[in-house]
A protein has these predicted regions:
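Transmembrane-cytosolic junction motif
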Residues: 43-65
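Structural signature of alpha-solenoid helical repeat junctions
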Residues: 92, 129, 149, 168-169, ...
Length: 219
């Protein structure tokens, strides 16, 4: 989302600079024309953004309406979801792909979720959702005992994961890293991350589960 806004702003600035360059070179000698053209561009940009927002809301409404299919006909649900993904772009597409992977993981289709997350590269997600994306991928890979792949993901996206350690899902990041470290025979680091996971949440049920995992690792 933020990248989209950044590139849109840069594009608008470049267009405005182009008009001033054309005027300086004598191609455009009418200030009224220049200002009118700039105004037209801004109006088109605003209309384009409004249409994009309207389309996004329409897709989200459709996504909500088909959610009941997850329990009754998951294959049909994912077929409908794929149609929405194909029609989307930018942040919206990245977010829907993340949603698809999360849903697959929740219904115990982890290998499919991993394939989606591994083969897609979310260029438009904000830092928070990128953290969710790669944390989920890391956790699923460790869960499926694909430790080599998990290590590659951790090494490549460590900065993104660490940039989210102040968020409300920091305990999950620490726990997934701890599980990876434990499988890599780095027990001390694993315990350290579990301690940090406990410190980063007030949820007693989560703390209880993390403590149980810590006790298991310490045996």
């Amino acid at each position: 989302m933020y990248k989209n806004k950044f590139f849109q702003t840069i594009k608008n600035i470049l267009i405005i600079m182009l008009f001033f360059w054309l005027r300086e070179k004598g191609y455009v000698n009418n200030w009224g024309f220049v200002l009118g053209a700039i105004g037209t561009i801004l109006i088109i940009t605003i209309i384009s953004q409004r249409l994009k927002i309207k389309n996004t809301m329409k897709n989200l409404d459709r996504l909500k309406s088909i959610s009941k299919l997850i329990a009754t006909d998951p294959d049909k649900y994912f077929l409908e979801l794929d149609t929405l993904i194909d029609k989307s772009s930018g942040y919206e597409k990245d977010y829907m792909i993340l949603h698809k992977a999360n849903t697959l993981a929740k219904i115990n289709r982890a290998s499919e979720a991993i394939d989606i997350l591994m083969h897609h590269h979310p260029r438009y997600l904000d830092t928070n959702n990128q953290g969710v994306y790669y944390n989920n991928l890391l956790g699923l890979l460790v869960q499926e005992n694909r430790i080599s792949d998990a290590k590659k993901v951790y090494d490549e996206f460590k900065d993104i994961l660490e940039s989210n350690l102040n968020n409300n899902f920091a305990y999950s990041i620490h726990t997934n890293i701890a599980n990876l470290k434990y499988h890599l025979n780095q027990k001390a680091d694993a315990i350290k991350h579990l301690d940090q996971a406990i410190e980063s949440t007030d949820n007693q049920n989560i703390i209880k589960n993390i403590q149980a995992l810590k006790n298991k690792m310490q045996k």
